[in-house]
Amino acid sequence: MAINEEKLNQLLGSCITDFGATMHAGLVVIGESLGLYKALAKAGKAITPAELAAATETNERYVREWLNAQAAGGYVSYDADNQSYFLSEEQAFVLADESSPAYLPGAFLLAVSAVRAVPKLTERFRTGEGFGWHEHDAGLFRGTEMFFRPGYAANLISSWIPALDGVEEKLKTGAKVADIGCGLGASTVLMAQAFPNSTFTGFDYHDQSIETARQRAEGGGVAERVSFEVAKAKDFPGNDYDFVTYFDCLHDMGDPVGAAAHVKESLASDGTWMIVEPFAHDRVEDNLNPIGRAFYSASTLLCTPASLSQEVGLALGAQAGEARIKEVITKSGFSHFRRATETPFNLVYEAKP
């Protein structure tokens, strides 16, 4: 067999890039946790490692090495003439501004937390057993919220809900809403803040996430109209909901058809179900790109094991695609299904009884 040196070098280059990126993920988590990015942005000019260490009460030698790694990765800018470091506006937008729709440190916390389960998941590959979200490192839940919240804040109120038939008007007047798989409550609180005449209940099977979500509601000033309860997707209480939401969670469920059927039972006759899922095409070959790679990898470590840990274990995966999602929704009894809108990272579907 003849080795094509050009292809070999391309592959080796990709491996080295990924090796550096894998190590770099932990450094982004450190930078976010210690406020290093925010301190660089606040400085508003190039500063030395000693100045950054002083501003963040950290060790200069560690900070200097961290800065060099960041500069090598393009996450921090380096002024060679003055041996100092700074954040460009774009770098600050992505790494230091929590209000930015492109704020990404949460993605790295999610990734670092997920890979801590690799030894256990390696064994599950052999046995076929699942691995529930609740079994993962606690950092995964904060990382997931940090990763998804900027996108929700940028799109949920301004474009996703308005793309649904008649939902925005109901929410403005006063609607009864259930947010299933709410996690730490980011989506629930965002909706409650935007629609003060409506009431919201967030449901999640993870009790520790529900405790945090209640704190988020208090901190967000919406606790009087928002409640959070521990419940699973197939048995959450209540009926006659005007609006039910699923944010990036349907594909995690072992029995999504059963979960969808319960949504149908819980909705008012003129109610709407919004399903937000990761962007995906129906064919594998159309998902072989950087976004697909990120979602397939996350799905291997998180989503597929989570589904396999539950009854039925359909394991749709994070790249299920519209055709498979539609099949699940229509099989559960819904008569109406459509793609309402999309972003480069999400597909937003509307279903009605």
Predicted features along the sequence, with ranges:
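C-terminal alpha-helical "lid/dimerization" subdomain adjacent to the S-adenosyl-L-methionine
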Residues: 276-331
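Conserved adenosyl
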Residues: 114-251, 256-258
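Short amphipathic alpha-helical interaction segments
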Residues: 58-69
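A short glycine-rich, Lys/Arg-flanked "PGG" loop and its adjoining helix->strand segment in the class I
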Residues: 257-269
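Conserved Class I S-adenosyl-L-methionine-dependent methyltransferase catalytic core
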Residues: 2, 6, 17-39, 68-175
